[in-house]
Regions:
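Sec-dependent signal peptide recognition
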Residues: 3-10
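Short, internal strand/loop/helix patches
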Residues: 28, 101-148
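Conserved helix-turn-beta segment immediately C-terminal to the redox Cys motif
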Residues: 50-51, 60, 65-88, 108-111
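Thiol-/selenol-based redox modules, centered on thioredoxin-like
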Residues: 130-133, 137-184
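Hydrophobic h-region of N-terminal signal peptides that target proteins for export
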Residues: 12-20
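N-terminal "domain-start" segment that seeds a small globular fold
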Residues: 22-45
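Thiol-based oxidoreductase modules, predominantly thioredoxin-like and allied folds used
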Residues: 81-98, 114-125
C-alpha cells in the first residue's frame, strides 16, 4: 500500500513539471514587422539590441494622458538604446475610432510624439496582430492587454521581459527601475 502511494505521488510530481517549460521563442521580436501610421513597413530588426516598450494606445481613453509619460520615457532613454512603440487599437470601448492620419495628427499635436506608432491593429483575440500573438505565445496571458495602455517590455535579446497593466504609469518607479537595469 505504501509503495503504491509513493509511486503514485512520484508520477504526479513528474507530470506536474511537464507544463512548466521555458518559452521556446520560435521567433524573436526582431523578426517581426508591421506597417506604421504612414503605411510604411516598420521592421523591428532595426531595434535589435535595444530595450523596447510596446504599448497599445488610444486617443479617447482615461489613460490617454500616459502619452506624456511615454514620450518623456522615450526622450530620457532613447540615446541609451531604448524605444517606445505605440500600437493603436479600438478594441477597448471604441476609444481609438480615428483613421491612421487622425491618430498621427492627434499624437503629434497634443503630445509631440516622435516615437514609432503603428497601423491601428487588434491586440487580443483571434484577430490579434502577429506581434501580440507572439507576446502571448511566449509570455502567457499577462502579455494580453486587458485595456488601453497595457505595456510589454522587450529585452535586448528580443524576448518579453515583463508586462505592466494600464494603471502603471510609464514614468513609475517600477518601470523606470526595470528599464535602467536593462540598459546598464
Amino acid at each position: 500500500m505504501f509503495n503504491k502511494s509513493l509511486i503514485t505521488y512520484i508520477i504526479i510530481i513528474m507530470f506536474s513539471f511537464l507544463g512548466k517549460t521555458e518559452a521556446k521563442y520560435e521567433k524573436l521580436f526582431f523578426e517581426l514587422s508591421i506597417k506604421n501610421l504612414d503605411g510604411k513597413e516598420l521592421n523591428f530588426s532595426q531595434f535589435k539590441g535595444k530595450t523596447i516598450l510596446l504599448v497599445n494606445v488610444a486617443s479617447k481613453c482615461g489613460f490617454t494622458s500616459q502619452y506624456t509619460g511615454l514620450q518623456l520615457l522615450y526622450e530620457t532613454y532613447r540615446d541609451k538604446g531604448f524605444v517606445v512603440i505605440g500600437f493603436p487599437s479600438n478594441q477597448f470601448g471604441g476609444q481609438e475610432p480615428g483613421t491612421n492620419s487622425e491618430i498621427k495628427d492627434f499624437c503629434e499635436t497634443n503630445f509631440n510624439i516622435d516615437f514609432p506608432i503603428t497601423d491601428k491593429i487588434a491586440v487580443k483575440g483571434s484577430d490579434a496582430n502577429e506581434v501580440y500573438k507572439w507576446a502571448k505565445n511566449n509570455f502567457g496571458s499577462s502579455a494580453v492587454p486587458k485595456w488601453n495602455f497595457h505595456k510589454i517590455l522587450i529585452n535586448r535579446d528580443g524576448k518579453v521581459e515583463d508586462t505592466y497593466g494600464s494603471f502603471v504609469k510609464p514614468m513609475s518607479k517600477k518601470i523606470v527601475k526595470k528599464i535602467e537595469e536593462m540598459l546598464n
